[in-house]
Regions:
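C-terminal subregions of glycosyltransferases and related glycan-biosynthesis enzymes
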Residues: 121-169
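Donor-binding/catalytic cores of nucleotide-activated saccharide
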Residues: 1-113, 118-136
Length: 169
């Protein structure tokens, strides 16, 4: 976590609390740090999401292919997570995809802060996102994908057409 960005996030959240404003999902940017290449890539949402205001799914724009809402960018209200009954299979990698996907329809209000809060370091051998490691764990990825697919009937359970479109990819 970036210290200055975390301080900004906490200040924003305190402001919501002081004004008695409910925000179900706080969204921020994240940065991929490719350690061995010495490069980094920031993933932000400033053209897809409204900034500096509370918004709903019906106010979102279109996401580019590289703008997925991943665990690194999402901070849910605790009661939203509890109500989601996240099905987390034990001893399984890639469950962060369940965390990033299943609670979304329960989020009625969101806030996007254009801050680089989380830095994700990639490139270590044996890391779960390493290509060779992913191939060995395809069964786990399939298990997670099936859980995500079975979590909703997108046309029956997801009210917002814009959220549905995002969730369908």
């Amino acid at each position: 976590l970036d210290g200055a960005a975390l301080s900004t996030m906490l200040s924003i959240l305190r402001g919501f609390e002081e004004r008695d404003q409910r925000v179900d999902l706080f969204i921020s940017n994240y940065v991929y740090e490719k350690v061995y290449e010495g490069t980094h890539t920031a993933i932000g949402y400033k053209f897809a999401l409204p900034r500096k205001k509370i918004f709903t799914w019906d106010q979102i724009g279109h996401f580019r292919l590289d703008q997925n809402l991943l665990m690194h960018s999402l901070c849910y209200r605790t009661d939203v997570l509890r109500a989601s009954n996240l099905p987390m299979p034990p001893h399984t990698f890639y469950v962060d995809n369940i965390y990033a996907y299943v609670p979304l329809p329960r989020c009625k209000t969101m806030y996007y802060a254009d801050i680089d809060l989380y830095r994700y370091f990639i490139g270590r051998e044996g890391q779960s996102v390493n290509e060779a490691t992913m191939v060995k764990r395809l069964d786990q990825q399939f298990r997670v994908t099936r859980i995500m697919m079975e979590s909703f009937h997108l046309y029956g359970d997801v009210e917002s057409s814009r959220l549905r479109s995002y969730m369908m990819g």
